[in-house]
Amino acid sequence: MPFSELLEQVGSTGRFQVLHVTLLCIPVLMMASHNLLQNFVATVPSHYCNAHANLSQARLSLEESLLITVPLDGAGKPQRCQRYAAPQWHLLGKNGTSGSGDLADATESMDAALQECSDGWSYNSTVRSSTIISEWHLVCDMHSFKQMGQTIYMGGVLVGALLFGGLSDRYGRRILLLISNLLMAVSGTCAAFSSSFSLFCVFRFGCGLALSGLGLNTFSLIVEWIPTRIRTAVGTTTGYCYTLGQLILVLLAYFIRDWRWLTLAVSLPFYVFFLIAWWFHESSRWLALSNRTEHALKNLKSVARFNGRHEEAEKLDIKMLHESMKKEMSCTQGSYSILDLFNTPAMRKRTLCLSAVWLSTSFAYYGLAMDLDKFGVDIYLIQVIFGAVDIPAKVVVVVSMSLIGRRRSQCAVLVVAGITILLNLLVPYDKQTIRTCLAVLGKGCLAASFNCCYLYSGELFPTIIRQNGMGWVSMMARIGAMVAPMVLLTRDYIPWLPGLIYGGAPILSGLAAIFLPETLGYPLPDTIQDVEESGSGRKSKMSTKETITLQDKQANLLKQSA
């Protein structure tokens, strides 16, 4: 019997699976918190230059000190990065409490020499009592360091994907999950107590590493202990756990206004997750493929007993396990690499088009999700809206993929996302409601695009190199997430350029998706030859295979997409 039947024999949807999946899904909530933590720990508060040192002896109110120290910008607000080179005493009235407001005073103030904030800044602590921006003065000439911090974190996610993927296949899912939980807990704790921005970035890089390890091994352990028929439901549930995690972050951030305590709050639970992870059973499928059949058999018997199938546990033996793994062992024979994604014309076209789709989706998604300050709306409210919109977006795209197909759905969500981002460039800044609605629609479309990506890519890559293909496009997504924060820096030179790039990328990739074949109702390709024959229009052996339905969509996806 195949391994799937062996899993049914020990209980594929019993108490073990319910508890196993539940305990694995809980950490996903906090993974979302780490991914979007920058929105709250790196909020840029309103700020202005501190007063001159010689004003400390003067008996002036805050308003008076600000009046003679900091010039106003075009919007009538105190400038953030400059102050008068010398106090402008003439701006105070004769009684020392109010300005005279005559033309001579105004002209003299305009001609006054300005200087940088050599005595530091004062920050508004109304929204956040403390952030890494106010802690290390990452403003004015240092403002680009904010985006650098997020890029370094995403760099850790990328390196972690490359590192933990191979280690997981070599040493197992459970041990890597334990290491990842501990790494996240320790790195997050150290980040919370960092004494410098450099140390903070180092530990956030560690958090990024851990996040990849958690994602990969969590989904691997889930998918390898459940049957194909419920993988869609479980995969959807896991996705909604991530969405719920975004809302939990808002709740934590609302009550914990200090960045250090907030970072600690989203990191400490991973110590608990580390202890829980000791209970998890290693994947028997991986153990058998790694020639550790005795351990695999022991785990299967343990699962059978946990599910109340004591008689079935007694029937299991090494011979039965070997028979069930014959097919899987034959599929692992042969050597394939990422180069096989580019060696043939049809395969190369699919890979390049999917690379563009994944990169632009992640690029635009994080470009929107990590720049909440620009909307002029309460950051807690906008984060709730941005998180909640994922729920209907994912439902709509699943229905759409069943009705009009994968290709049209993928093209539509990308093009609509790009158009909404570009339209925001035309809306005046004071029309915040319209700007926010367009951004929310765009973010929802990009969340839907992620959902579509996972299914569509898994159906386009042939079985023998599906894991390599999903690994490649996932890497493209992480590169997009790394680049996204740095694009915001171009705003200093051309204010509308980031929006143009964020909006143009998904439109171009949506057009690229037109060149991909439709997969709705078609069988999964098993070999590169299947892909080439399908691309050339010749009749393929695939035509005799059983087609798949949407309910089977994540049968081969969850492991690879982690």
From Swiss-Prot:
Superkingdom of the organism of origin: Eukaryota
Principal location listed in the UniProt entry: membrane
Effect on the protein upon substituting residue 34 to I: Reduced transport activity
The keyword Transmembrane is annotated on this UniProt entry: yes
Pfam family, one: Sugar_tr
Aminoacyl-tRNA synthetase in keyword set: no
Stretches assigned to the Extracellular side: 37-147, 196-205, 257-260, 373-378, 430-444, 490-495
Ranges that cross the membrane: 16-36, 148-168, 175-195, 206-226, 236-256, 261-281, 352-372, 379-399, 409-429, 445-465, 469-489, 496-516
Record key words, sorted: Cell membrane, Membrane, Transmembrane, Transmembrane helix
Spans within the Cytoplasmic topological domain: 1-15, 169-174, 227-235, 282-351, 400-408, 466-468, 517-562
GO cellular component, one term: basal plasma membrane
Record note on modification: Glycosylated. Glycosylation is necessary for proper targeting of the transporter to the plasma membrane.
Membrane protein topology class: Multi-pass membrane protein
Subcellular location field: Cell membrane; Basolateral cell membrane; Basal cell membrane
Gene Ontology MF: a single term: transmembrane transporter activity
Family: Belongs to the major facilitator (TC 2.A.1) superfamily. Organic cation transporter (TC 2.A.1.19) family.
Record function comment: Involved in the renal elimination of endogenous and exogenous organic anions. Functions as organic anion exchanger when the uptake of one molecule of organic anion is coupled with an efflux of one molecule of endogenous dicarboxylic acid (glutarate, ketoglutarate, etc).
UniProt remark on domains: Multiple cysteine residues are necessary for proper targeting to the plasma membrane.
Name this polypeptide is given: Solute carrier family 22 member 6
Gene name of the encoded protein: SLC22A6
